[in-house]
A protein has these predicted regions:
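Terminal alpha-helical segments
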Residues: 1-138
Length: 138
């Protein structure tokens, strides 16, 4: 399904989830900020792909598709594709670790304020780049 309406919904929901990221940041729940930021980025980028008529893969990191389909994306986004792809890859690496941890690592003890701030900034930047191409964009 390549529905622009579905893509616009993803982008709208990504914007709404930024409030959750901010609430988690205020609660100093650093691991949850990282995890939720990854989900924001995933939704926003998959929304962008759908709006552009590109079926997103059912994986968490769509960076390779963004780069491969750069020419099909809105002109204003094309200049940001590399940084958007880097943000997607970066947060994807932390997706499970931030949520589940590992035998020798608890997420709350591993992630720091700086990690959370960086993840939140990636999420904000991604939504800001993608949002103009959502519900009322091109």
């Amino acid at each position: 399904m390549r529905s622009p309406e579905l893509g616009a919904d993803y982008i709208r929901r990504a914007r709404a989830r930024l409030a959750a990221v901010d609430a988690l940041f205020a609660a100093q729940s650093w691991a949850d900020v990282v995890r939720e930021s990854q989900e924001v980025v995933e939704l926003a980028l998959k929304g962008l792909l759908r709006v552009a008529g590109i079926e997103p893969p059912r994986i968490h990191d769509v960076s390779e598709v963004l780069v491969a389909e750069k020419s099909r994306l809105p002109q204003a986004v094309q200049q940001h594709v590399e940084s958007l792809a880097t943000g997607s890859r970066t947060l994807r690496r932390d997706r499970e670790l931030a949520f589940y941890g590992a035998e020798d690592l608890t997420p709350s003890g591993f992630y720091t304020r700086d990690d959370a701030a960086a993840a939140r900034e990636i999420a904000r930047t991604t939504v800001a780049a993608v949002e103009p191409h959502g519900p009322t964009g091109d």
